Regions:
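Second-shell residues forming the walls of enzyme active-site clefts
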Residues: 1-118, 122-126, 133-136
């Protein structure tokens, strides 16, 4: 548990891994959702250097493997104050860690255009999953 709000600053959680799995992560085990969002939280005892959205270990080893999540992983808003002010760097870090999509809620058209020019094309897995979900909704 953290007393911080990632809209304002970076929350840091010091719980032991075993406690995190039992109390926090277990809720997501074998979740059948098509989408899941990462959190801008630093789990000190899991990855002491990277917040969850930027952590290859948390995304690939925990969310994808241990929790068996097979859907699209979306970053939380990359313009939140818990992160640096460089949106392109934030987007790259999230995608490189394993997020399929990045969320930008800042509403600045110039920043949105800049991000779109710099981001890579959505991968085949994400396209396929998004299309499947779209067909499900129809």
């Amino acid at each position: 548990c953290s007393n911080s709000d990632s809209h304002l600053n970076l929350p840091i959680v010091y719980k032991k891994k075993s406690k995190l799995y039992k109390e926090d992560f277990s809720l997501f085990k074998n979740l059948s959702s098509n989408f899941m969002m990462t959190a801008h939280i630093l789990y000190k005892n899991v990855d002491s250097k990277n917040l969850a959205t930027f952590s290859n270990n948390i995304i690939n080893q925990i969310i994808r493997k241990k929790l068996n999540f097979k859907g699209i992983l979306i970053s939380d808003d990359i313009s939140m104050k818990a992160l640096s002010k460089n949106l392109s760097v934030n987007a790259d870090k999230a995608l490189n860690a394993g997020c399929n999509l990045v969320l930008y809620c800042g509403g600045n058209i110039k920043e949105s255009s800049k991000l779109l020019k710099n981001l890579r094309t959505i991968d085949e897995f994400t396209q396929k999953k998004t299309y499947q979900f779209y067909n499900f909704l129809r």
